[in-house]
Amino acid sequence: MEILIIKDKIQPKQRPRFWKGKVFTPSQTKSSEKRIAQEYKRQCKTFFTGKVEMGIRLYVGVKNKKQWGEPCLSHFDCDNTLKTICDSLNNVAYTDDSQVYKISAQKIYAPFYYTIIKIK
């Protein structure tokens, strides 16, 4: 099992953009994917070859202390953020995100943005 900690907000996956007949990924999404891949290489060593299971906790930074630890029902879509995480780990933690057969995710209020990703 590997545990990856990202100490920043992860950009949810954005729709592809079209310009002059070409398709491209927005720069915010690309930079977020690159940062996650770099952090995985720095913090973790395992390359998974079989089935992959992921547990993800997305901590959303808010100033109100009363909300800390509570489920977050606003801000960004959880599924788009999961897509960014899974895509960024292609050829880094596993060959392709099609190997991921089970994902559990939580979005929780916290004092600052960070993400904990468990992969097994």
Describe the function of each predicted region.
Residues M1-K120:
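Acidic, proline/glycine-enriched N-terminal capping motif
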